């Protein structure tokens, strides 16, 4: 089968390619797992203009431009929004819901009802902050959420705050050299019974880490989010009445609050992340609304990906001690909806993603009503990366260290190392494109496969690091077989992928939606120019070289379609061979500040607004 596909790839008409010049409607089917919403999201390609490969526009103008900049090109139409009829077909009730005239995407101050005293603070200006997220580096990681929860916790601690991070103690959780000690137990009523967890407490880089030890809920095979029927070796047909994700994370949310009581730490701020922790604000507003221990506590909820909502049967509400109306959303219990409604502040991981989920029902995934109902809005705060962890000058997992001044030499050495590792032709002058992500439809893997032929035709190479389903893996293997020496692949590995970033000239990241994204920030740090779609945080973090050749640090695909990606790749190859433009673009990318410091400033300002304190936080 793989050999047959490889032969098809070599035929004149690419077996994956879109018809050139045609408007394409792409309907991703998003498999979100247990407790998730799974809509079909139509995304349409806009009109496309012919490619011009001529200089002086080094990265290839889409059309001749009157502007003085050698990189300038008029912005091609962004992917067209679907017509109202398309929205009605998706969900007539949602389509009929108009957006508010004043967009609730804002960073405005939150109304303060209770002025906060400093009695709970360790010292003047410092806050007791509880961070609640289902995963965190270095203990457990399945995705970017773990990086963000860890970096935010350590960053706030480094600024003088007393930070407590609460995690479930999963079976495959790593202790990371932290010595955990038993600190008592917490008990939570669920469905007429009482569930109890041991509290294990340790310290990691200044952060108090609390593990909830509940073997039945968390110490099971298959990872943090494995369904119970999977852990028991049962089929999906046998799952009815067995799966317990609603109880596992309903317990987690309330147990995190009870842990603070046992440890006698009154939190000033509780910062919950994604649906797994989204019930914490709801517990504060219902079960604990008259509890003096949490009387001065304020809550914030950060939405990392609104597609993951924690949607269950409405009976879940009663099991956790809520009225059904409190969790009800379109006939089911929805944890994310409850958190959006009850949190004192709601943020998400980039300004553009905040706009998308509030203003566009397709991105809101059915939660546009509670989002728009928040009078103070939704604030977008971009994620950062750790500049110490991701530093090509010190990274132990790359072939040669380098900085801005010797990036060309360092890149060449790392490129040769990766080419040798993957069996690619050793060609230092060849533009090297890499992919480092899940090989999924949401990440645009179909467009990447479609465009591989164009990369090879233009004399480039493609290296793919990631993992996908069986069909995707078969297609990847066929691609490598069809283009020996030009296309290589490697399983995704945190250490191995560092060499990809250090070796590459361009990162391909054509996501259909991307709340923030970290790979493009890491790529820029390593002098690799990202090629991205204009969505979510990608639009906030990549400046198109065709619009701003002086400060640009990547290329933005003009529409979500394979032909648009192929044209951006052609632009990239054109610019790569320009003796001045490419080094300048690489320098701009490496000089960019993508650290957590600006975002930590914004989070501290948000906490101050919630607590009603004036002036900067004292450290």
Predicted regions, residues:
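Hydrophobic core
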Residues: 9-14
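Sec-dependent signal peptide recognition
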Residues: 1-7
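Catalytic cores of nucleotide-sugar-dependent glycosyltransferases that transfer UDP/GDP/TDP-activated
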Residues: 117-619
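Long, low-complexity repeat tracts used as extracellular stalks/passenger repeats
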Residues: 15-121
């Amino acid at each position: 089968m793989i050999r047959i596909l490889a032969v098809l790839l070599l035929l004149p008409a690419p077996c994956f390619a879109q018809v050139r010049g045609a408007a394409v409607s792409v309907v991703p089917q998003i498999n979100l797992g247990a407790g998730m919403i799974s809509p079909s999201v139509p995304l349409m390609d806009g009109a496309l203009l012919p490619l011009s490969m001529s200089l002086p526009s080094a990265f290839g103008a889409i059309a001749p431009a009157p502007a003085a900049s050698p990189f300038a090109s008029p912005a091609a139409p962004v992917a067209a929004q679907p017509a109202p009829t398309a929205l009605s077909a998706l969900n007539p009730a949602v389509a009929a819901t108009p957006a508010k005239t004043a967009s609730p995407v804002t960073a405005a101050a939150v109304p303060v009802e209770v002025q906060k005293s400093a009695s709970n603070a360790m010292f003047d200006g410092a806050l007791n902050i509880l961070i609640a997220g289902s995963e965190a580096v270095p203990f457990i990681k399945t995705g970017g959420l773990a990086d963000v929860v860890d970096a935010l916790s350590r960053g706030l601690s480094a600024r003088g705050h007393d930070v407590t991070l609460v995690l479930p103690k999963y079976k495959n959780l790593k202790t990371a050299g932290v010595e955990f000690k038993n600190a008592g137990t917490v008990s939570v009523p669920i469905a007429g019974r009482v569930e109890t967890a041991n509290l294990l407490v340790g310290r990691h880089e200044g952060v108090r880490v609390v593990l909830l030890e509940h073997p039945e809920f968390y110490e099971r095979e298959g990872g943090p989010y494995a369904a119970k029927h999977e852990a028991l070796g049962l089929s999906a047909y046998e799952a009815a009445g067995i799966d317990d994700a609603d109880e596992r994370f309903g317990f987690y949310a309330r147990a995190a609050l009870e842990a603070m009581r046992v440890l006698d730490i009154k939190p000033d701020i509780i910062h919950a992340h994604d649906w797994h922790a989204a019930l914490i604000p709801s517990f504060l507003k219902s079960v604990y609304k008259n509890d003096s221990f949490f009387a001065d506590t304020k809550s914030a909820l950060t939405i990392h990906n609104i597609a993951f909502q924690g949607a269950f049967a409405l009976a879940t509400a009663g099991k956790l001690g809520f009225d059904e109306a409190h969790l009800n959303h379109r006939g089911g219990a929805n944890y994310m909806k409850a958190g959006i409604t009850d949190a004192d502040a709601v943020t998400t991981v980039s300004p553009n993603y905040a706009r998308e989920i509030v203003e566009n029902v397709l991105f809101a995934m059915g939660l546009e009503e509670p989002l728009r109902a928040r009078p103070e809005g939704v604030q977008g705060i971009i994620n950062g990366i750790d500049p110490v962890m991701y530093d090509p000058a010190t990274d132990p997992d790359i072939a040669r260290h380098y900085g801005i001044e010797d990036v060309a030499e360092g890149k060449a050495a790392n490129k040769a190392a990766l080419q040798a590792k993957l069996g690619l032709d050793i060609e230092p002058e060849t533009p090297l494109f890499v992919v480092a992500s899940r090989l999924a439809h949401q990440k645009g893997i179909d467009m990447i496969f479609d465009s591989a032929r164009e990369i090879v035709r233009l004399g480039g190479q493609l290296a793919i690091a990631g993992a996908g389903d069986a069909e995707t893996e078969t297609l990847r293997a066929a691609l490598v077989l069809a283009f020996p020496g030009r296309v290589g692949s490697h399983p995704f590995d945190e250490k191995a992928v560092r060499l990809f970033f250090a070796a590459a000239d361009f990162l391909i990241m054509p996501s259909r939606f991307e709340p923030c994204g970290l790979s493009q920030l890491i790529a820029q740090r390593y002098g690799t120019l990202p090629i991205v779609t204009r969505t979510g945080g990608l639009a906030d973090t990549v400046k198109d070289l065709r619009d701003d050749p002086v400060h640009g640090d990547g290329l933005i695909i003009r529409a979500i379609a394979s032909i648009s990606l192929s044209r951006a790749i052609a632009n990239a190859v054109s610019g790569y061979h320009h003796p001045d433009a490419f080094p300048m673009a690489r320098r701009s990318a490496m000089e960019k500040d993508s650290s957590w410091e600006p975002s930590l400033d914004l989070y501290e300002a948000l906490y101050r607004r919630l607590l009603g304190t004036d002036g900067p936080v004292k450290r």
